[in-house]
Amino acid sequence: MTNIRKTHPLMKIVNNAFIDLPAPSNISSWWNFGSLLGICLVLQILTGLFLAMHYTSDTATAFSSVTHICRDVNYGWIIRYMHANGASMFFICLFMHVGRGLYYGSYMFLETWNIGVILLFATMATAFMGYVLPWGQMSFWGATVITNLLSAIPYIGTNLVEWIWGGFSVDKATLTRFFAFHFILPFIIMALAMVHLLFLHETGSNNPTGISSDVDKIPFHPYYTIKDILGALLLILVLMLLVLFTPDLLGDPDNYTPANPLNTPPHIKPEWYFLFAYAILRSIPNKLGGVLALILSILILILMPLLHLSKQRSMMFRPISQCLFWILVADLLTLTWIGGQPVEHPYIIIGQLASIMYFLLILILMPTASTIENNLLKW
């Protein structure tokens, strides 16, 4: 008799995705982040669900309800901080996952890559709306500044902003709709993640060499299941270290002050994972130009397959491209630092140079390096 996991309609799907899936024998720990993102998503949905049971999306009580969760709800503080720091872990895993894709040429799986970019946008939108919910100073002013960017759109801008606000400023209507969207989006993300996986399993995984691994496959279980469990344990270890020892390390102290439309904080800045994009936005003096640069800084990922001019898929055997890749990483770290600094003398020019460098590296320098490496192969 055939094993039930290979015949049962539901178990068959799980079996083909996580048990008998043929996987390359040489994928490194950089391939762990997909499963870690899945764990992060489930964790965020569960902690978010329990937070939603006690949260009220009304401007008068939102801040108090978060305080109530932390002080009066059994283990509410740990749920709240797991959710807040879980978002940070989510983005760390996302950036590593995207970086892996760029380094090893995984973007050549077009459908998988494009769904991934959509997933990135959806996750960023969810995180932004979630940051507004506690209704602290940075929540309110962050929402005001970022939604206001839409007013840069010619002709329909102002109407669009007021439509999103549900009034003439960020208020009760805005908070309520943001809560509704923040609740529904993770489930859409989950559905998209399944499509992401579906497309990936059409082609099979890439591997560090970028060469077809059809000649040497191993079953996903037990090899990669045990590897994923190790990754998950490390993820939970880091998350719980953050939650239990320094829960507010990555937060903003201003968010412990209730939202006040009459008092603007001296430095409005988003959560750390948006700072690189925020720095690019601020480095362009023109409002519309800044908004376009902000969107393009992430949308540029869609162009990666077009910008791939190398005869080799992976960067494993391409030293010049490797060097440029790590310069790009350093550049993004620089932008992240600049995004959190005030808009004054040394920081403005550093931000502008780092922004130019970012687009220059991706659009010009890396494709040029690829062609140079192609020619070096002929020698």
From Swiss-Prot:
Cellular localisation: Mitochondrion inner membrane
Binding of a ubiquinone, residues: H201
Keyword Nucleus: no
Binding residue positions for heme b b562: H83, H182
Gene3D superfamilies listed in its UniProt record: Cytochrome Bc1 Complex, Chain C
Cofactor list: heme b
Keyword Mitochondrion part of the UniProt annotation: yes
Keywords, comma-separated and alphabetical: Electron transport, Heme, Iron, Membrane, Metal-binding, Mitochondrion, Mitochondrion inner membrane, Respiratory chain, Transmembrane, Transmembrane helix, Transport, Ubiquinone
Cystines in this chain: none
Name of the protein in question: Cytochrome b
Organism: Redunca redunca
Gene from which the chain derives: MT-CYB
